[in-house]
Amino acid sequence: MADGEDIQPLVCDNGTGMVKAGFAGDDAPRAVFPSIVGRPRHTGVMVGMGQKDAYVGDEAQSKRGILTLKYPIEHGIVNNWDDMEKIWHHTFYNELRVAPEEHPILLTEAPLNPKANREKMTQIMFETFNAPAMYVAIQAVLSLYASGRTTGIVLDSGDGVTHTVPIYEGYALPHAILRLDLAGRDLTDCLMKILTERGYSFTTTAEREIVRDIKEKLAYIALDYEQELETAKSSSSVEKSYELPDGQVITIGAERFRCPEVLFQPSLIGMEAPGIHETTYNSIMKCDVDIRKDLYGNIVLSGGTTMFPGIADRMSKEITALAPSSMKIKVVAPPERKYSVWIGGSILASLSTFQQMWISKGEYDESGPSIVHRKCF
């Protein structure tokens, strides 16, 4: 390897549902695997099978039938540090096959992440993994970078949490950031419930993954929900079939758009919250009147839960209805938006101007974990 190459920074975007990890400068993450740690439900009886006390990611996924699955990140925020450490260990050693002590590491965090969380992340990187340098960046800001903008409002919706983050000339405006605890996992739960009402039983953590797959493959967002419901009642044009792992085939119709409609109408699952369109609008309205025009014209979608077909048109329609009538509204849905946080991180970590931003091991040893608040905005 060339001299310059072995110090390629690592970029690790830890989401509630998936970990996206790889090398700065690459155009896509090398490793994408579920943020799951699984522990055996039964004690092993076969000797020499090399059973482990914990499985991470895809391996946990494939053995899900015999494991209890745990998600160390909930609503975008880490709540189980031991498991999180296992995930990071797996990321560096098994997925990327690198020695973390040789690479600067860029991590991502949810907007409005508690301060203590940020410090704990920093501490683990330096003390457990001996990183030479690290940095923590806000996810939505990275998505905006990836779209080639410095001003706009990002609607970032993943598996565990949705945020609207207005950014002006590269600065996130914290007073106007809004968080909505409604995201992909809730939609999966909602679909599980709808399917259960129809007589299919999906209950275990393993079966939830099947429902997630159905959602990702078949769900879409209706431009006009009521109209679509009428269509679904009167014709079979929206029906699609899906084959379960055991060969059973199920047909889903109106569920295809009933499930993601929750993003616009959280009341459908009994949540007292504004929909994503209203949250975006409220977020814009919390900003200075002079910059609103720039935000309305740069609404950037990011995260896996914005991958539903039809979301950009519907978003555009709903925001047009809320905004002043002469306002030009543009909703941008980049095709790679599932990974745009990671891509933004890859761009940021490879900028020459960013190199002085890293927190070095030396600075950490001198100041302790609180250094992260001074160096990372």
Curated annotation (Swiss-Prot):
<comment type="similarity">
    <text>Belongs to the actin family.</text>
</comment>
<dbReference type="Pfam" id="PF00022">
    <property type="entry name" value="Actin"/>
</dbReference>
<dbReference type="InterPro" id="IPR043129">
    <property type="entry name" value="ATPase_NBD"/>
</dbReference>
<keyword id="KW-0206">Cytoskeleton</keyword>
<dbReference type="InterPro" id="IPR004000">
    <property type="entry name" value="Actin"/>
</dbReference>
<comment type="function">
    <text>Actins are highly conserved proteins that are involved in various types of cell motility and are ubiquitously expressed in all eukaryotic cells.</text>
</comment>
<keyword id="KW-0963">Cytoplasm</keyword>
<protein>
    <recommendedName>
        <fullName>Actin-3</fullName>
        <ecNumber>3.6.4.-</ecNumber>
    </recommendedName>
</protein>
<dbReference type="GO" id="GO:0005524">
    <property type="term" value="F:ATP binding"/>
</dbReference>
<keyword id="KW-0067">ATP-binding</keyword>
<dbReference type="InterPro" id="IPR020902">
    <property type="entry name" value="Actin/actin-like_CS"/>
</dbReference>
<comment type="function">
    <text>Essential component of cell cytoskeleton; plays an important role in cytoplasmic streaming, cell shape determination, cell division, organelle movement and extension growth.</text>
</comment>
<dbReference type="GO" id="GO:0016787">
    <property type="term" value="F:hydrolase activity"/>
</dbReference>
<keyword id="KW-0547">Nucleotide-binding</keyword>
<dbReference type="GO" id="GO:0005856">
    <property type="term" value="C:cytoskeleton"/>
</dbReference>
<dbReference type="InterPro" id="IPR004001">
    <property type="entry name" value="Actin_CS"/>
</dbReference>
<dbReference type="GO" id="GO:0005737">
    <property type="term" value="C:cytoplasm"/>
</dbReference>
<keyword id="KW-0378">Hydrolase</keyword>
